[in-house]
């Protein structure tokens, strides 16, 4: 008997240790919950509401497909060039006496720009005029002698040889006078050239020579450069495949519209008209150069400025148009999410035509009036019901949709 008690005591201790370990493990896996009846009932009700609640509908923005007249453009990167550019040079040599323009000023054709010292050319003109007057007097005297010789020849007092010699002298003097008249005209022209005038209407650039310098007609830099910017041209290139479209559009007889957009292609600068096409294709790039002319009275275009040119070659009538944001690309091509009368969405394949950053023409797959999703596309599934919201309220709707519903575990 005495030996049984120690064995039973050891077994009892082992059982107690196992029970304590099991209880600790259970307590660790299942923390204590509020034991009040009110709390238990509240928790139960809260859980029921959470399990039965519906998630909010996905907020989206939508737009209806519409029919519009859509212009078709050919795009190209262009450079603004002056309609005419002239380097004003002196035609005679001399000291620059005065300048009559301000850098950057608009000038008219014939307007005085600068003056060269005219005195050497005034002297040359006087010399030429004096020589002409002397030879004219010689001619008058030769003609009088010829008249006398002709009278005397009738009475045989003058030989025929003397008469012929006098005739030759008159003719020679006439030739000398012609040369003198040319010298006078040349001197007058040189004197005129001492006043440098603008050959065209345009804007003057920076002066290349200061007053007091001796300038020559062979100076390559010239006095100033004038660019004609009213009108102004834009030269750009399009692919050779587009030549037939341009030629076809020109058959209408109406000048083709050309738009000049800024470097970012976001803002329209001005509109002009097609002026001409080059007569050959650039074999290196496979493009052809096009020149458009712009009135530019507001000076929005400046020589050597880069612009994006758009040449209008056609207009699509009654085209189905949707916002560009609605068009998506998948493995099977372009598609849109269409919203039906029950506000449920479905994916629909479409054929896209002309498009820009704002709109896209749908050639097939949509009808005018169909509603398409333009924003909130990332969380759509086939047949899902959505809530169409205005642009300003979509952010609020998305915030609410991302929060857990009442009753959902956090």
Swiss-Prot record:
Keywords of the record: Cell inner membrane, Cell membrane, Membrane, Signal, Transport
The keyword Endoplasmic reticulum is assigned to this record: no
GO MF term list: efflux transmembrane transporter activity
Principal subcellular localisation of the protein: membrane
Example of a GO cellular component annotation carried by this entry: efflux pump complex
Subunit relationships: Part of a tripartite efflux system composed of MdtA, MdtB and MdtC.
Name by which UniProt lists this protein: Multidrug resistance protein MdtA
């Amino acid at each position: 008997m005495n030996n049984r008690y120690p064995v039973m005591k050891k077994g009892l201790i082992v059982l107690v240790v196992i029970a304590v370990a099991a209880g600790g493990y259970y307590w660790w896996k299942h923390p204590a919950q509020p034991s009040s009846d009110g709390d238990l009932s509240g928790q139960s009700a809260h859980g029921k509401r959470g399990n039965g609640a519906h998630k909010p509908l996905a907020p989206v923005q939508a737009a209806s497909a519409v029919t519009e007249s859509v212009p078709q453009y050919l795009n190209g990167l262009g450079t603004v060039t002056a309609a005419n550019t002239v380097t004003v040079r002196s035609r005679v040599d001399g000291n620059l006496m005065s300048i009559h323009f301000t850098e950057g000023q608009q000038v008219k054709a014939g307007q005085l720009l600068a003056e060269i010292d005219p005195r050497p050319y005034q002297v040359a003109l006087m010399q030429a005029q004096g020589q002409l007057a002397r030879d004219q007097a010689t001619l008058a005297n030769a003609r009088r002698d010829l008249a006398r010789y002709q009278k005397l020849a009738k009475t045989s007092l003058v030989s025929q040889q003397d008469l012929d010699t006098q005739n030759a002298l008159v003719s020679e003097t006439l030739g000398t006078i012609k040369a003198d008249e040319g010298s006078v005209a040349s001197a007058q022209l040189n004197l005129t050239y001492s006043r440098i005038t603008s050959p065209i209407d345009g804007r003057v650039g920076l002066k290349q020579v200061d007053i007091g310098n001796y300038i020559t007609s062979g100076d390559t830099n010239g006095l100033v450069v004038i660019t004609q910017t009213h009108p102004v041209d834009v030269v750009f290139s399009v692919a050779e495949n587009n030549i037939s479209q341009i030629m076809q559009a020109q058959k209408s007889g109406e000048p083709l519209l050309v738009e000049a957009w800024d470097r970012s292609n976001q803002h329209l600068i001005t509109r002009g008209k097609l002026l001409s096409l080059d007569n050959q294709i650039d074999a290196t790039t496979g493009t052809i150069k096009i020149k458009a002319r712009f009135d530019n009275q507001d000076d929005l275009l400046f020589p050597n400025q880069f612009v994006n040119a758009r040449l209008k070659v056609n207009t699509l009538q009654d085209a189905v148009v949707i916002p560009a944001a609605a068009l998506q690309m998948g493995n099977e091509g372009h598609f849109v999410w269409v919203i039906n009368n029950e506000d449920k969405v479905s994916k629909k394949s479409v054929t896209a035509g002309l498009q820009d950053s704002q709109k896209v023409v749908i050639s097939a797959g949509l009808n005018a009036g169909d509603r398409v999703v333009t924003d909130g596309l990332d969380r759509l599934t086939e047949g899902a019901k959505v809530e169409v919201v205005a642009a300003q309220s979509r952010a609020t709707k998305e915030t609410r949709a991302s929060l857990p519903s009442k009753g959902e575990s956090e």
